[in-house]
Every structure is written in structure tokens, then in C-alpha cells.
């Protein structure tokens, strides 16, 4: 009962956030150091998923600052990282790279996802317990809000999610 209630509350909060993004209710932008956001959230996920023995490599060359709402920048990075950590098998590798205004997060995988569906609300290629199916929809909403290019590709048993700033 408690788990179901918690899931419904999280689902409701996420849907409200999606609606706020789509309605343009995040006008305050500031200069965000994405390197710091990525490093902070990567450290957090490494701690949370330490028991799964995932190898996470961060390759950030140079400065990477953008003009965004701080909350939305965090939402974007958080959901991309969470997706990689949740959908990686124990002992596998996650690679995060930032260069030339592009952030790419990749993780091991065995089969390509449906690129026409993965960013849609409630789509779940492989159902994971506790998942709302809204994480990548949030990523898509933030990218659309800021006119960022969002791309998914699968190559040599790896999933690649890339966001490029103009």
C-alpha cells in the first residue's frame, strides 16, 4: 500500500513538472556550470548504485556553461543519469562525455530501443520496478523548452543519449 501511494505521489509530481515546463513556467535563467552539475549527480548515483559495481567514467574537456533555469538543468542531467544507472546491468560501464557543446551519456545494452517511442510519456522499453516512465519525457520537455537537440542512437551494444546546446 505504502509503495503504491509513494508511486502515485511521484507520478503526480512528475506530471505537474512536465506541465509547468510545457507551459513555460521557468523564466528565470542563470549561468550554470554543467560540469559541476554532472559531477555532483554522478557522485550521488555512484554512491546509490555502489552495490551493482558499475564503472562510471566522466570525460569533460574544458568549461561547459549554459544559460538555463537551475532546476531544469538539474532535472535534465538527473534523468539522463538515472536512466543510464537504472538500465545498466551489474558490472557494466557508463560513460559521460562533454565536448563541443554536447553532453553524451552512454551505457551498455543488448538491444536497440525504439527511438520513435523512448521520449514519449509512459513508454517503458523494459519495465523497471518503481519507474514512472516519465524520465526521458522530462528530458525531451526540457530540451524542447530550450531548443536543444536531443538524440538517441545504439552502436556496438551501447545506448547513447546526446544533448547539444546551440
Predicted regions and their residues:
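Short beta-strand/loop element within the Bergerat-fold HATPase_c
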Residues: 91-102
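Glycine-rich ATP-binding loops of the HATPase_c
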Residues: 147-155
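Short alpha-helical segment of the dimerization/phosphotransfer core of two-component systems
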Residues: 3-8
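Conserved micro-motifs of the catalytic ATP-binding
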Residues: 23-28, 65-68
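Short conserved segment of the HATPase_c
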Residues: 111-124
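Short helix-loop "hinge" at the ATP-lid/N-box region of the Bergerat-fold HATPase_c
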Residues: 84-85
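Conserved catalytic submotifs in the C-terminal HATPase_c
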Residues: 55-65, 99
Amino acid at each position: 500500500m505504502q509503495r503504491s501511494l509513494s508511486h502515485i505521489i511521484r507520478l503526480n509530481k512528475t506530471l505537474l513538472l512536465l506541465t509547468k515546463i510545457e507551459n513555460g513556467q521557468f523564466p528565470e535563467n542563470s549561468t550554470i556550470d554543467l560540469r559541476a552539475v554532472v559531477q555532483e549527480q554522478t557522485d550521488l548515483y555512484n554512491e546509490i548504485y555502489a552495490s551493482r559495481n558499475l564503472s562510471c567514467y566522466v570525460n569533460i574537456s574544458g568549461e561547459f556553461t549554459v544559460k538555463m533555469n537551475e532546476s531544469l538543468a538539474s532535472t535534465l542531467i538527473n534523468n539522463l543519469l538515472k536512466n543510464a544507472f537504472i538500465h545498466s546491468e551489474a558490472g557494466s560501464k557508463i560513460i559521460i562525455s562533454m565536448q563541443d557543446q554536447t553532453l553524451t551519456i552512454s551505457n551498455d545494452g543488448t538491444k536497440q530501443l525504439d527511438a520513435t517511442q523512448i521520449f514519449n510519456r509512459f513508454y517503458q522499453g523494459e519495465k523497471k520496478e518503481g519507474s514512472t516512465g516519465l524520465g526521458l519525457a522530462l528530458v525531451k520537455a526540457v530540451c524542447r523548452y530550450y531548443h536543444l537537440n536531443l538524440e538517441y542512437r545504439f552502436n556496438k551494444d551501447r545506448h547513447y543519449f546526446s544533448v547539444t546546446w546551440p
